[in-house]
Regions:
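Flexible, active-site-adjacent loop/turn segments at secondary-structure boundaries
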Residues: 18, 42-45, 51-52, 81, ...
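Class I SAM-dependent transferase core
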Residues: 1-71, 75, 105-122
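Conserved beta-strand/loop positions that form the S-adenosyl-L-methionine
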Residues: 77-79
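Short, flexible micro-motifs
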Residues: 46, 81-88, 167, 174
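Conserved SAM-binding loop of SAM-dependent methyltransferases across substrates and taxa
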Residues: 81-94, 154-157
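S-adenosylmethionine
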Residues: 95-98, 102-215
Length: 215
């Protein structure tokens, strides 16, 4: 099942400008293998084939680094199987990460990955974002598949520092782009919308960046 994953990831990451170290590649491989093993028992993802997983999960996650230099603290809301939070942590070990996942079995998987990969400075919050301590504060909030765009902005905004950013990883839906320009009432300003195509014709993506106004 995992045959070809490493080669596909390495080739396409290099084409995208990422030279992955052997340590990073080993961690991505372990992550993928564990994902496949757990997915046979609990529903984590429908994206399991090597090429699909390499591009749609791992490369898609780290492509975010092309558009914003992540530093400080990141909260990944509705992380599911850990994308993009865990790949970003692997790429940037100095990043402090909180993964928010309401489903207990998925949260247990995330904790296992953190132990397996020996990652420090990353934790799992097993619960809904609405129940997280409002004193928690981050430089970035990211979501790849959480709810609809407006809901993500409303729920994530209280946890972002002034001047911090919300990063919505979406498909190419025009309605999401339009909605991005209508969030000023929530103290957010759209600073950029990046649209791009994944390699191997694996789909189109948009990254919507919303900055929280300074208060």
């Amino acid at each position: 099942m995992t045959t070809g994953f490493k080669e596909i990831l390495l080739i396409n990451a290099q084409k995208a400008g990422f030279l992955l170290s052997e340590e990073i590649v080993q961690k991505f491989e372990l992550y993928y293998k564990e994902l496949i093993d757990w997915n046979a028992k609990i529903s984590l993802t429908t994206i399991t084939e090597p090429a699909d997983a390499a591009i749609k999960h791992f490369l898609d996650s780290i492509l975010l680094l092309h558009y914003i230099p992540l530093t400080g603290g990141l909260i990944d809301i509705g992380t599911g199987a850990g994308f993009p939070g865990i790949p970003l942590k692997i790429m940037k070990p100095e990043l402090s990460v909180v993964l928010v996942e309401a489903v207990r079995k998925k949260a247990n998987f995330l904790k296992q990955i953190i132990r397996l990969l020996k990652l420090d400075g990353i934790e799992v919050y097993n619960g809904r974002i609405e129940t997280l301590d409002r004193h928690a504060s981050f430089d970035y909030a990211v979501s790849r598949a959480f709810s609809e765009f407006g809901m993500f902005c409303r729920l994530a905004e209280p946890f972002i520092k002034s001047g911090g950013s919300l990063l919505a990883m979406k498909g190419s839906e025009a309605k999401e782009h339009t909605a991005a320009h209508e969030m000023t009432d929530h103290g957010l300003v759209c600073t950029a919308i990046h649209s791009y195509e994944l390699p191997m014709q694996k789909g189109n993506r948009s990254l919507i960046i919303m900055q929280k106004c300074f208060t």
